[in-house]
Amino acid sequence: IDEGIAGYREETVHSAEQLTRRLGIEHHCISFTELFGDSLDTFLKGREQQACSICGILRKKGLVSGAHRIGATKLATGHNLDDEAQSVLMNVFRGDLSRLIRNSGVDSSGKFVPRIKPLSLVSEKEIAQYLILNEAWTELPECPYTRYAMRREVRSLLSGFEYRHPGTMLRLIESRQK
C-alpha cells in the first residue's frame, strides 16, 4: 500500500519491489490516491495527531480491496511478534479489550478475505538477522508520523521488558490466545 507519505513511502515501495523481484514473488502496489482520491499527507493536513488511526483504517480497506482485485483467497501480512505484542498492550492501555478477540478481515461490502500472519511469532530482531545473513537487509526510514504514535512508546516499553525479561512478548501473545 502506497499511502503517499512524501519522502518516506517512495523508498520503501522501491525496496519492496527489489526484494520481491529477488525472491521471485509477485508484487502488487496500490495507492491511497488510486483508492481514495488523495494521499495520506493530504488527508492529514491539520490532523497529524490522528495519523496512525486514519492510516490504519485506510490501509486495511486498501489491503482487502487489493486482495479482491487480484483474486487472492488469503491476505498475508508482515506483522511480527513485536507488532503483535505492541497491539495487545495498546488495546489493554486503551481499554479496548474487544479488539483482543476480534478478527478484522471484512471490508465494507462484507466480503471476507482471511488474513494470515506467517511472521507473527518471529521477532523483529530475528527477521533483521535473517535479512542480514541473506544479504537482503535494507535500512529503511521510519514513518514521519510515528512521532505522534502511542505505538512508539509501547515499543520502547516492551523492548525494555523483553531485554530484562526474555520471552515477555511471546507470553503476552500467548495470554491473548487463552
Positions of predicted regions on the chain:
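ATP/NTP-dependent adenylation/nucleotidyl-transfer catalytic domains that generate, transfer
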Residues: 20, 28, 98-178
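ATP-dependent adenylation/nucleotidyltransferase module used to activate substrates
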Residues: 1-106, 120-134
